[in-house]
Amino acid sequence: MRGFMSKDGNLDTSEFDTLANKEYTAEQKQTLEQGQKEFLSQTTTPELEADDGFIVTSASFAQSTPSMSALSGNISPDSQTSDPITKAVRETIIQPQKDNLIEQILKDLAALTDRDLAEQKRKEIEEEKEKDKTLSTFFGNPANREFIDKALDNPELKKKLESIEIAGYKNVHNTFSAASGYPGGFKPVQWENHVSASDLRATVVKNDAGDELCTLNETTVKTKPFTLAKQDGTQVQISSYREIDFPIKLDKADGSMHLSMVALKADGTKPSKDKAVYFTAHYEEGPNGKPQLKEISSPKPLKFAGTGDDAIAYIEHGGEIYTLAVTRGKYKEMMKEVELNQGQSVDLSQAEDIIIGQGQSKEQPLITPQQTTSSSVEPPQYKQQVPPITPTNQPLQPETSQMQQSQQVTPNLLNTATALSGSMQDLLNYVNAGLTKEIDSNKQIDLIKEAATAILNNEKSDIAEKQANIIALAENTVNNKNLKPDAKVAGVNAILETIKNDQNTPNLEKSKMLEATVAIVLNSENLESKQKQQMLEKAVDVGLSLKDDASRAATIDGIKDVVIKSNLSTEDKGTMLIAVGDKVNVSELSNAEKQKLLGSVLKKDVEAQVLSPAQQQLMQQHLDKITAEQTKKDTIKKVNDILFDPLSNTELKTTNIQAITSNVLDGPATAEVKGEIIQEITNTVAGSSLEAQDKAAIIKGVGETIATHSDTSLSLPNKALIMASAEKGIAESQTNLPDRELMTKGLVDGIYEGKGGPEITKAVSSGIDNSNINDSEKEALKKAKDAASEAALDRDTQNLTEGLKGQNIEEHKPHDDIYNKAREVINAVNPVIEALEKSKEPVVSAEDRIVQETSSILNNISKLAVEKVNNLRAMLSPNGNLKTLEEKKEESIKKVDELVKAFGTKSSTEEQQSFIKTNLIDDKTLSKEVRLQTIDKLLQEQKRAEAIENPSVKTEDVRVVSGKSKLKPISKDNPDIEKAKMVVGRDRVNIKGNIKIMGALMNARDIIQSENLNKSIPIKRESSPPQR
């Protein structure tokens, strides 16, 4: 569990530096093995309190110490390792832990439903084990992380790993301690109290040369009592802990230093040596000889008692809570320094508070097992959920059995117990007599509670008998005519509460009692639906309070089946099941467990067809919400894994976070939920410890991913909504304003890189407006956004200028009507001519048939020619409305002017783009020539704007054609874009606003020019008629 996990969360194949060039003797090896056996077999042997720390003095060796970076790879084979401590830890701790873990993984694979995957992984393990018994490749493969995590969640395996670890390190420390005669072995740290304050202590750490490396200060904090929740739901009170000011930078003297501080118990005292765990900081000698913080070692998982920087760290180990001597703020500061020094964080449970001072000796120093590189501590503010903290002024009351509580408040309990000594029927008779005699409903409920307590505490009954008696008591309560309806509800709920508080009944048996009680209630004819629902909800509450997830799942499944099989109407069944779902939804369970329970309820309910469509939709909404929350949590965990991976550069981090963003956008969640997740992503990136430029690069990638995402799966309004959320995450981050400005620019750059439209860019401003920051910060971020937009538009202007070079905008001259009609006749006759040409193929039939076919073809030509000539004659008549070329040109110029004038009435870019599409591209009633002339004129005239008298005033609506400065037609070789920019230089915003319009016009021109026209085919004439 700890002792072999790497920083990226994978099993590490490296362990620690060699200690000395010394082999185990047979006697030493036998001593170690015997010590471990004795430790694992002992029960309650008294242990001494763990010392606060040790000092290890380096010994002199001729060989230099291997660097930590060299040890981050695979462990050398046993034959290449002569260090006795390395061998001891490998053989007694690391390898046994790995063996146990693999054994559990194989068990989990055997139960896996995907048999192909299970067999693949099983073979992978077996094949690798033949090559390398440490399975370093398997443990180092990220694809195997889910199997490792699942195995580590097994309670029995956790116990085994903790036992192996504690026993192994205890034996190593005992064997290699100074007290055991080992040269340079472990010695206690000497803390000295401050004269002025009893809660302050200090110690000076020196290297071998006697030079001071640093002074450590320890502060004992006595705080207002607060409680921490353990994994099993129980709470522990904390009122005292300590903080140690671990140094970040060391520049006094040369050498190395290793600080390992013992974790304190919940009451602020030190644990016994056999239960001690540690927080360790490793300072390795840097290039300049000064110590650098390279590693952090701590038990896993590391949690913090709050969200502030002063929140103290704590862990749960062996079912107990221990506080560590580091705060959240100090931990973040240390982790940043570790990353800066390219070190790695590791997870170890040490056996003593240890300070290892190493001097500037050219000979090999002595290094302890505390230098092992094992499981990593992920940044806890992201990796681990902080459990609820409940401040209290009162000490926690000791847990007592229900029997003891009842004896204090209920003097008649002895009577019910006496009644039960005869038979269950005697007890029921006693209870019923009391319910008849007693009018006060509170006393009636107390009597029912007494009976339930007597049943569960009856030592003469086994579990089956207790269960049967509880069911009989519940049925008696429901059917008792002397109880009012509300008293029946309170009486059954009292029975359920008694079941909950009983310390002797196993959880699964409690689950059966709850299920049976619900069955009695739902099938009773003496209760209304409202009262049944109240009792059902109480039973669900009790079931969800059980200590293990298997019992909770069994209870909910059981109650669900009871509802479906009950004699309730279909409508009432649906109501009851919705009540079960609501209780699960509002419980304190994790989202993952809620998701599992609700999914199970919904599936069974749909199969049984007891939920109405509206009820199904309601439960599905609850499930979707929980799924979205779990997805958000999982997504941010992945983002943090990427951000804190010291082995990946900014480009790789950007690519990986872009992939996560794309997965979110493709997911089934609503746009609002997707926006919330994207906001968390950008907020997490912005708040990370990366450099500002790196964060801006990652944010740019997120913006580009959103802008380029498929419009079919994500509509434009939804893209804008999500982009606004992305900017809100940046704006509301806790990083400084200049960094946020840089990241806002990065987001805008990403939008332009992804060819996002104006709606997407405007969404950035919307995100700023909706963020919870002050007005001055909003203004600064908007300026940053505008600056990025302006820079992007400048690039577009330059690209447009380059794109226009070499293009020739020619005037398209319309043909007159006569030419067009003649061309139409030619095009119609051509197919007939082609058919006639085919008749010239080699003659294969009789002469008469050839004459007949030729006559038919000529007849078709004659009819078609007559039809076209008549049409031409009608057109040439006085009523034919025939227009000359000059008239046609004048009409075209007029139509072009009308279109240009209509275009000028459109004030916004969106309206102008719509006009181009509707009137120039889609309107085929206008001739191709008119539309192309309109586009050419708009391209020439659109870019001219009259200079504004006041140069400081810039608006996007200034579109007055200048009469003083005219732009020459764009030539083929040198388009005069630069001149246009000079003419309206004081209103550059106008040009930039029209860049998109110019692009739209050129795009429309290309579309019109590519429209398919019937190509004319010249009539082929033969020199002589066909041969007969």
Curated annotation (Swiss-Prot):
Cell compartments where the protein resides: Cytoplasm
Chief localization: cytoplasm
Keyword annotations: Cytoplasm
Record-level GO cellular component terms: cytoplasm
Highest taxon above the source species: Bacteria
Region (Disordered), start-end ranges: 359-405
Pfam name, any one: 120_Rick_ant
Record InterPro entries: Rickettsia_antigen_120kDa (IPR020954)
Residue stretches of biased makeup (Polar residues): 359-384, 391-400
Protein name from the UniProt record: Antigenic heat-stable 120 kDa protein
